[in-house]
Amino acid sequence: MAHGKVTETIPARSGEVFALIHDYDRRLEWDTLLRSAYLDDGNTEAARGATAVCTGKWYLGGIALKTVYVTFDPPKLAAVKMLNKPPFFGSWAASLRHEDIGEGRSRVTYTFTFTAKPRSLRFVLEPLMGVVFELETRKRLRALKRRFERRPGSPGGVSAG
């Protein structure tokens, strides 16, 4: 089983960051990993028990993960686990923890865990997939940070006048 953790400081309060991350209508405004993201099974907003489908960019295999929110506690914590069985993933789960750190900033910690398939190739696939997923997650969180840096009124952001 592979594990990883990536942390980024965002120039916004945890409530704002949490809301943007789980707004599927706006997800592709900042998420560099995905080519599509939507709530599924009639869900109209992220919540405990809601399902979502996120499909990676083609250069990463274009794999679609269908997940269910197992925890949804705004603005602190959200966690999902994989429901489908796409190529190369036997299991997959992730959490996003948000913490206000003062001066209008927050810390986002993304933790993931997965098993690769086929089982006979886990010893090769998990280290490789883990490195790629950690790098892509770091890239995603940096893009999220830049998204908040560009908003009016942010330090280094667009001026309001």
PLM features: residue spans?
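Hydrophobic ligand-binding cavity/cleft-lining segments
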Residues: 1-44, 159-161
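Short, surface-exposed coil-to-beta transition loops
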Residues: 3-5, 62-67, 89-94
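Generic structural detector for well-ordered beta-strands
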Residues: 7-11, 38, 68, 81, ...
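Short, intrinsically disordered, mixed-charge
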Residues: 19-26, 130, 146-150
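Glycine-rich portal/gate segments that line the openings of hydrophobic small-molecule binding cavities
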Residues: 38-87, 103-107, 139-161
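Beta-strand/loop substructures that line and gate deep hydrophobic ligand-binding cavities in soluble
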Residues: 82-135, 155
